Amino acid sequence: MAERVEIVYDRGRWRLFNAMRREAAAMMAPLRAAHIDCLAYGSLARGDVSDGSDIDVFIPGQQSPTIVEAALERHGVRPTGREIVQATPGYAAKAYIYTAELRGYSLPLVELRPTEREFYSFAGSIRPEQVEAGLRVPGVDKRLMLIEPTPGGHVESHVAGREGEVAKLLGVGINIVLERVRTLERRRRVGRTGVYLKRVLSPEESFSEVLRELSLSRPALRRRTR
């Protein structure tokens, strides 16, 4: 049986959690008003936030970045930066719209593969109404620890060797769990490697035109945009 360690949150951590949830709800509001589906994921969904936690509102599906940007602009949200990122040649390219340090929105620019979609459930994800309700869900953190919320904090346990059990608990396929275990264990051994592609956009550029431009010289990206 896996060793389970209980973590009890102090008042400061609960205050941080509640403040970040309010901020996430405000960030999601412009998208909800435009009927754009969105998720909060990671530590914000699980509850194990820290001072270094980010708020990345993820927009699933292949929503037009132009429509997303227009929805944000209507509510006075101004980006501080925008970029296209493709982590590896095989991964989906994504648009990132930053609004402050450790705050922003992301959306895929190509159709996601099943394991890419399931990553968000693997990490723990919730919808806007669940953000507002204070719901916390189980998920796996960057240490490959399964985080299971409790009334006073959470219980954490190792994922390695329990991939099937964890997949069942999170409602995801075994492949995403095995893939993340391989990726994170390799990262532990060799360190974090740089991303395959990162292209910062100027205020005048659109995501669609830059993606089209990049795909002309990047075969791996071009294959994912077909």
Spell out what each predicted region is:
Residues 1-37, 45-51, 61-226:
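Catalytic core of pol beta-like nucleotidyltransferases
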Residues 54:
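Charged, often glycine-rich, active-site loop that binds/positions anionic groups
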Residues 42:
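Short loop/edge segments at beta-strand edges and connector loops
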